[in-house]
């Protein structure tokens, strides 16, 4: 049987734009879940969320007018407790029935059924299914209560409020209307936030053809709002329309220009308008002398405009505005937006011109007045630490010129923090440093490194372009990690105010993707001297932290937990080689010999752990059993070949060479007693196993591949 569809709308004052989409999805999602839980909507029911600046709504398909009655079986008590020897109800049973709204007349109808080892009494009854009005009342209250509201407003209801007992309400914004339609039927008994449901809503604040818009049925809601109310109610439809208009406007301008791609800005603008209208505006070309990042940021962040870029990605003097009105003559709207943006761009030009009057080097001294952390000193002290770490890293790489340029870039990397432009737009730190370094005539490698030393800023971000940038970026992140761990300022749960997890992943990415010939623990220790006595040595805990981040990253890349565990158990120092080690482990695990060798390796590990400190020396004269002689001979024959492949970086070949050891290893454990009574035999056999263990576990701890 087909049931009518349901439409519910809350009409409110302008909702916070950055939360709108989440609010709309949550409102619709909870509403559907609650209706399904009460049996009013089925698993086949579908919900469509509507969210605009002044409304949250949901359209649910196939909603029953009343839920089906439910058979309920209530366990009462054991028969021996509820009935006496004559079969009459005991006072305990009568009391229980009374609590459930029944009396002694229900006793003959009680059902007996096994309950564990005893027999119990059950009261079978039928519970009437909730009507849609009853169920929607509960669902609506739950939907409102569970909205992810960023900040709650408390407001007084009007004196004409129809809901008795309601005087004030807490909600994200004041609500002024409630629509609840089941097909064409208005669910008049439903209420929320002091509002009683009806079928009238409001369209666009200025351009609605009629007001109020009387919704005829649940299925005509979106169409009527569009035709009579001049509102595109669905967030996704409105977003798509804005994107279409942006592209069309860019094509109208011509010359291959395109609007800047920014999903967050598009989402925010979608949440600001109900009837989008994209207009082309422009500003004076003289402002293009200012770095385009400054102009783009001020237009996006302050005005919600879409700058137009040419085919090479350069900013043009035109931009697109998403208006909420469609006047016959748009010139006033265009002119108003052009007037508004001009002072913003003039401010950016003023900051840029003023900042260039001083060199970056002359600003470094001012960093001594900027506090970085009360336990780690000023930004000036931090700069000196980053310089020292950068020099140490460059020396490990062995490039004198790299060390000189890295030192210069590290000295100037934070200088733009005390410029007017970065003071106004903190997001431009590093970027403005590059521009000012170029204006000061510094080498391109140094200028690029100043911008790139913050990279990667987020997951998926690019890495520094050149070697100088990589060295300074590594030094900057190591300074933060070592410093914060050294004072015990560690991330906890969701709290990571200094982005230490991101910094650790940045270090990992640079070491791996740039294939740097640097050892992790050497890097960590090289950062310590720069701090003097300000911190405790955190290298052990910091190394654990970095390996944990590496493990998580590798699992996200598709490696199994066993593979990752096997490689990282060895605490590899050259992270750039971890990928080759994992590939070798995966190839080894696919061999038919792998399970037996992994299990044997686990057994060897346990034996050696119990034996304590075991020397890998083997005396051939003490080999008595044929199986141990065969294993020794196999090690002598194949381990040198495997070692040579390992030294050449062929980890896969190294492990595959050792696969031939399966047969002699199996025979050894079948025929040889390792813990012989004679001490010299026992030590010799343990030494043989130690030799096997060393040979097998150079690439990874293969015992971690054994099935538990």
Swiss-Prot record:
Reaction catalysed by this enzyme: tRNA(Gly) + glycine + ATP = glycyl-tRNA(Gly) + AMP + diphosphate
Keywords: Aminoacyl-tRNA synthetase, ATP-binding, Cytoplasm, Ligase, Nucleotide-binding, Protein biosynthesis
Subcellular location: Cytoplasm
InterPro entries, sorted: DALR_anticod-bd, Gly-tRNA-synth_bsu, Gly-tRNA-synth_heterodimer
PROSITE patterns noted in UniProt: AA_TRNA_LIGASE_II_GLYAB (PS50861)
Enzyme Commission code(s) on record: 6.1.1.14
Chief site of localization: cytoplasm
GO (cellular component) term, any one: cytosol
BP terms from Gene Ontology: arginyl-tRNA aminoacylation; glycyl-tRNA aminoacylation
Example GO molecular function: glycine-tRNA ligase activity
HAMAP family: Gly_tRNA_synth_beta
PANTHER family referenced in this protein's UniProt entry, alphabetically: GLYCINE--TRNA LIGASE, CHLOROPLASTIC_MITOCHONDRIAL 2, GLYCYL-TRNA SYNTHETASE
Family named by the database record: Belongs to the class-II aminoacyl-tRNA synthetase family.
Subunit and partners: Tetramer of two alpha and two beta subunits.
Designated name of the protein: Glycine--tRNA ligase beta subunit
Biological source species: Paracidovorax citrulli (strain AAC00-1) (Acidovorax citrulli)
Gene that encodes the chain: glyS
